[in-house]
Amino acid sequence: LPTEEELADLVPAKGSVTWRLAGDARLLGGAGYALALQVAHPTVGAGVAQYSAFAVDPWGRLLRTLDYVNGTIYGGPKLAGAIGKRVREVHRTIKGTNADGEKYHALEPEAFAWVHATLASSIFETGRRFGHTMTRDEREIFWQEWRRLGRLVGVRDRDLPEAWRSFEVYFDRMVRDTLQDHPTVHEV
């Protein structure tokens, strides 16, 4: 996790691409998109099925995710750092055996990075649907800002693609080769 000195460099600046895009309340419409992509990952799906209260408190789950996104983007470095530590700590004890009989841990780098990546995709895709067109340079800036935000929760740079175009390839590969259709996907 980042030091206090590093926090200011990780939080998007006021008026940045991420700051402007993520502030559109209409992007809430992408929450289901992100959640479905997240839980389709076998590790995330197992953790959600075994530990999450989404089934009994879906609105609470949504609000906690919104608190995370809004707090890390708009809350300033100190709040963003505290949120990052809390998210990491909450996930530290989430582990078990998935539906395929394989052991999992919520902090597996691939799965943890995937959750972060789905939020970027949701913001981008939902924003695009509402007319937030971005130039190639803006997409790249957004992705670099989003990668830095990932460091707040301990997502390592090496677990996310370096550039937006690489992200698109990574995203398609994850959907094609890693995500699974299992009961948790249908429950959310």
Indicate residue ranges for each PLM-predicted region.
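Mature, function-bearing regions of proteins
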Residues: 1-188
